[in-house]
UniProtKB/Swiss-Prot annotation:
This is ATP synthase gamma chain. It comes from the Bacteria. It is found in: Cell membrane. It comes from Exiguobacterium sibiricum (strain DSM 17290 / CCUG 55495 / CIP 109462 / JCM 13490 / 255-15). GO terms for molecular function: ATP binding; proton-transporting ATP synthase activity, rotational mechanism. It is a peripheral membrane protein. F-type ATPases have 2 components, CF(1) - the catalytic core - and CF(0) - the membrane proton channel. CF(1) has five subunits: alpha(3), beta(3), gamma(1), delta(1), epsilon(1). CF(0) has three main subunits: a, b and c. One of its GO terms (biological process) is proton motive force-driven plasma membrane ATP synthesis. The lineage of its organism: Bacteria, Bacillati, Bacillota, Bacilli, Bacillales.
Length: 283
């Protein structure tokens, strides 16, 4: 049985760990609120662009663009969004497992390319000998479009230049504080864009020119929007994980304290027994 000193050291160590996890939980809660606000501010821009493009794409003029049209798929691009840090529960494992399963089941080595956001994702693929075509790491907790513009434009241009025939977006979608859903969505070709209203517009210059200008921006906005959504999911997952760790620390401290008290009581009983036995032996 462990000594009283060893048990007390374990209790103190667990209390120190609890302080850290509790602090991380509070920090993640604060970051979650900011990330949600940041994501919400971006939504009106994306919805308005969807409204305009949907009106053109679904109109009667027959305006079209290569980004809207399907073509035979010889190579697929994957944008995989992960975090730079761990301690976020199954946040990274879930999306990486899904992407890894899909590329193993559906692709040969030269029929896909990976664009990865986050150190965890980069390390995951490289440790398995999988080439990462492009990556970005070190994003802050509320990234701006400028922070990710290079990789976003690179992925969209890979499709428009014919380097890939479809582009998939893989990330964790925020459902609630305790729930995130892994999404693997086909981003390009865009397919049908639903108009969010019945508003009609007159366009200058032509609708084809507007599509050519706005469709790449719309695709880029979808990627950035998914990144903001994933950031919200990351903070929520980390907050939940740290709360769970704090609760587990409380349980462990309670059990160790019970063991400590029993051991202390046993030690006291042993001392009393020895004193009584010694006194009896002297009589």
């Amino acid at each position: 049985m462990a000594s009283l000193r060893e048990i007390q050291m374990r209790i103190n160590s667990t209390k120190s760990t609890k302080q850290i996890t509790k602090a991380m939980n509070m920090v993640s809660a604060s970051k979650l609120n900011r990330a949600q606000a940041h994501s919400a501010k971006f939504q009106p821009y994306m919805l308005k662009m969807q409204e305009v493009l949907g009106t053109i794409a679904n109109g009667t003029t027959g305006a079209s663009h290569p980004m809207l049209e399907k073509r035979p798929v010889k190579k697929t691009g994957y944008i995989v969004i992960t975090s730079d840090r761990g301690l976020a529960g199954a946040y990274n494992a879930n999306v990486l497992r899904e992407v890894y399963r899909e590329i193993n089941e559906k692709h040969t080595t030269d029929s896909y390319v990976l664009f990865v956001v986050g150190k965890v994702g980069v390390q995951f693929f490289r440790s398995r000998g999988i080439t990462v075509t492009d990556a970005i790491t070190g994003l802050n907790d509320s990234p701006s479009y400028v922070d990710v513009a290079e990789i976003v434009k690179r992925t969209v241009s890979a499709f428009t230049l014919g380097e890939i025939d479809e582009l998939k977006l893989c990330y964790n979608h925020f459902m609630s504080v305790i729930s995130q859903e892994v999404k693997v969505e086909t981003l390009l070709p865009l397919g049908e864009i639903e108009a969010s209203s019945s508003t009609t517009y007159e366009y200058e210059p032509s609708e084809e020119q507007i599509l050519a200008e706005l469709l790449p921006r719309y695709a880029e906005s979808l990627i950035f929007g998914a990144l903001l959504d994933a950031k919200v999911a990351e903070h929520a997952s980390r907050m939940t994980a740290m709360q769970s760790a704090t609760d587990n620390a409380d349980d462990l401290i309670g059990r160790l304290t019970l063991v400590y008290n029993r051991a202390r009581q046993a030690a006291i009983t042993q001392e009393i027994t020895e004193i009584v036995s010694g006194a009896a032996a002297q009589q």
